[in-house]
UniProtKB/Swiss-Prot annotation:
The UniProt record lists the keyword Lipoprotein: no
Name used for this protein in its record: Large ribosomal subunit protein eL18
Protein family according to the UniProt entry: Belongs to the eukaryotic ribosomal protein eL18 family.
Originating organism: Canis lupus familiaris (Dog)
Molecular function in Gene Ontology: RNA binding; structural constituent of ribosome
Location, primary (coarse class): cytoplasm
Gene from which the chain derives: RPL18
GO CC annotation terms, alphabetical: cytosolic large ribosomal subunit; rough endoplasmic reticulum
C-alpha cells in the first residue's frame, strides 16, 4: 500500500504580481519585468520585487533619513531610489541638492527638494536614465516603524519584556499595579 505524498507545502507563497489594480503601477511592472528579464542587473529584479509588495512592506521614507543615507561617503551625485513614498520631515532645517526617484513624493517634501535645486524622477524616467541602475542607491523606509510592532515579542508582564500591552486606557487603574511595582505583589 502506497503512502500518499503531502502536497500542502508544495506551493511557494510569493507575489508574482501586485495585488493592486492601479493601472499605472501595472505599467511600471510591465516595464521592469522587461528590464529584469533583458538586463543582467540585480537592481531591476529588486525594484520589480518591491513593486509587488504590500503597503506595509513599502513603508514611507522620511526626508531626514534619506538625507542621512545620501550623505554617506561615496554616495555623492547618485540617485536615491525609493519604491514607496517620500515624506517631509519638519525637523530638517536645510535640504541639500538631491536627485530622487520614488513612486510618490508628498507635496511638502516635493516642494522642498525642488526648492533646493534637486530633481524628482518617476520610475519610467529612471528606466531611461539608468536602465541597469548605475549610479543609484536603493533606499527603503523602516519596516518595523509601525506602532503594531511594539505589541509583538515576549508577552507583556514577563521578565525583561518591553512589549506594549493592549490596554483599553492608559489610566492609573489599568495594568499599573500588580507586576509593575514591588509594593503590589511583585515587579517584573
Amino acid at each position: 500500500m502506497g503512502v500518499d505524498i503531502r502536497h500542502n507545502k508544495d506551493r511557494k507563497v510569493r507575489r508574482k504580481e501586485p495585488k493592486s489594480q492601479d493601472i499605472y503601477l501595472r505599467l511600471l511592472v510591465k516595464l521592469y519585468r522587461f528590464l529584469a528579464r533583458r538586463t543582467n542587473s540585480t537592481f531591476n529584479q529588486v525594484v520589480l520585487k518591491r513593486l509587488f509588495m504590500s503597503r506595509t512592506n513599502r513603508p514611507p521614507l522620511s526626508l531626514s533619513r534619506m538625507i542621512r543615507k545620501m550623505k554617506l561617503p561615496g554616495r555623492e551625485n547618485k540617485t536615491a531610489v525609493v519604491v514607496g513614498t517620500i515624506t517631509d520631515d519638519v525637523r530638517v532645517q536645510e535640504v541639500p541638492k538631491l536627485k530622487v526617484c520614488a513612486l510618490r513624493v508628498s507635496s511638502r517634501a516635493r516642494s522642498r527638494i525642488l526648492k533646493a535645486g534637486g530633481k524628482i524622477l518617476t520610475f519610467d524616467q529612471l528606466a531611461l536614465d539608468s536602465p541597469k541602475g548605475c549610479g543609484t542607491v536603493l533606499l527603503s523606509g523602516p519596516r518595523k516603524g509601525r506602532e503594531v510592532y511594539r505589541h509583538f515579542g515576549k508577552a507583556p508582564g514577563t521578565p525583561h519584556s518591553h512589549t506594549k500591552p493592549y490596554v483599553r486606557s492608559k489610566g492609573r487603574k489599568f495594568e499599573r499595579a500588580r507586576g509593575r511595582r514591588a509594593s503590589r505583589g511583585y515587579k517584573n
